[in-house]
C-alpha cells in the first residue's frame, strides 16, 4: 500500500502547507494532494482558502520526491482543455509525478458567488465524461478534434506533452454507483472515494460490474480511500470524529464511522488489513477534521509504527 496526505486549503498559510509537505516527504509518505475550493462551504463564506493549482505547482517544485495531486479538481470550474494544458505543465515541473484528480463539482456556494453555472447533477456528470475524453485526447494526440454535447476541439494542439506516458495518472473522485462509477470504468486510471473497507468493498463490486460492461480489467484501476486518522484508546473520541465527518461531509460520507481510521494501533492495523482485502492500494489521510498539531503527531506515529507492515 501507499500512503498520502490530503491537505485542505482552508485556514492555511502558504508557509504552513510547505512546511507540512516537506515534513511528510522527509518522514516517508508517498503522495500529497490538495483540495480544490475557493471558499468555505458555509452560508457566511468567510475564511481564507488557498488556490489549489498555483499552490500545487509551487509544492511540486519545492518538494521533489512524493507524487503530487488533487482531490479533486471541480470540472465545472475550468474548461477541460485548459486543465489538460495546466496538467501537462505541472507534470513537467514535477518530473512526471502528477496525480490528476477530477470530479463533477459539488460545492454550490462557489458557483453562486462567482457566477459559475451550477448544472444539474446529470449534466455535471455528462460534462465529466466528456472532459476525460478531451484531456486524454490532448495529452496523447498531436492534434485533437472532438465534438461533444458540451465541449469542442478543432485541430487542437497541446505541446509540450506531459512526462508520464501515455498521460498523467487520471483519478476520478466519487462514489455514485449508477453513473460516476461507469465513468470511472471508462476513463480512470485511479478511483478515489470517502470511506473505509465496507464502502470500498460495496462500491468496488459495482465498479467491477461497470468494468465488465465496458470490457475492462478492473485490476487496471487503482483504488484509494480517504479516511480520517485518530490514534486513541478512547471510544468517545472516535464517535466525536465520526460526528464531525457526518457534519462536514454530509451526503459525501456514505458511512461516517467507516470513514474513521481510528482506534489503537492494533485496531488501525486491522482496518488496514480489511482495506487491502477490499482492493484498496492507496490510503489518503485528510487534514480537515482535526487541529493540525494533533493530527501531525498521529501522522508521524502512523507512518513509523503502522504503515511499514503494509508496504
Regions found by a protein language model. Name each.
Residues 1-311:
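Active-site-adjacent structural elements that line small-molecule/cofactor binding pockets in enzymes
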Amino acid at each position: 500500500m501507499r500512503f498520502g496526505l490530503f491537505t485542505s486549503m482552508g485556514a492555511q498559510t502558504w508557509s504552513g502547507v510547505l512546511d507540512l509537505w516537506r515534513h511528510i516527504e522527509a518522514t516517508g509518505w508517498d503522495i500529497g494532494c490538495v483540495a480544490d475550493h475557493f471558499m468555505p462551504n458555509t452560508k457566511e463564506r468567510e475564511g481564507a482558502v488557498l488556490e489549489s493549482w498555483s499552490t500545487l505547482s509551487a509544492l511540486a517544485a519545492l518538494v521533489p520526491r512524493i507524487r503530487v495531486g488533487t482531490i479533486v479538481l471541480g470540472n465545472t470550474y475550468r474548461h477541460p482543455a485548459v486543465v489538460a494544458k495546466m496538467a501537462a505543465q505541472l507534470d513537467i515541473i514535477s518530473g512526471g509525478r502528477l496525480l490528476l484528480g477530477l470530479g463533477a463539482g459539488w460545492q454550490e456556494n462557489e458557483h453562486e458567488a462567482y457566477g459559475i453555472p451550477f448544472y444539474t447533477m446529470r449534466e455535471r456528470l455528462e460534462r465529466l465524461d466528456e472532459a476525460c475524453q478531451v484531456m486524454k485526447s490532448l495529452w496523447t494526440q498531436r492534434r485533437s478534434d472532438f465534438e461533444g454535447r458540451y465541449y469542442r476541439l478543432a485541430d487542437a494542439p497541446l505541446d509540450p506533452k506531459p512526462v508520464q506516458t501515455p498521460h498523467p495518472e487520471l483519478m476520478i473522485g466519487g462514489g455514485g454507483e449508477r453513473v460516476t462509477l461507469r465513468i470511472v470504468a471508462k476513463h480512470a486510471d485511479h478511483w478515489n472515494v470517502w470511506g473505509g473497507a465496507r464502502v470500498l468493498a460495496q462500491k468496488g463490486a459495482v465498479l467491477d460490474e461497470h468494468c465488465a460492461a465496458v470490457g475492462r480489467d478492473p485490476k487496471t484501476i487503482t483504488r484509494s480511500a480517504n479516511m480520517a486518522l485518530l490514534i486513541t484508546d478512547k471510544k468517545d473520541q472516535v464517535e466525536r470524529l465520526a460526528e464531525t465527518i457526518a457534519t462536514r461531509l454530509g451526503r459525501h460520507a456514505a458511512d461516517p464511522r467507516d470513514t474513521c481510521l481510528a482506534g489503537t494501533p492494533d485496531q488501525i492495523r486491522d482496518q488496514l488489513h480489511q482495506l487491502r482485502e477490499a482492493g484498496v492500494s492507496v490510503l489518503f489521510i485528510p487534514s480537515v477534521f482535526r487541529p493540525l498539531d494533533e493530527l501531525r503527531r498521529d501522522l508521524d506515529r502512523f507512518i513509523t509504527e503502522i504503515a511499514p507492515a503494509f508496504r
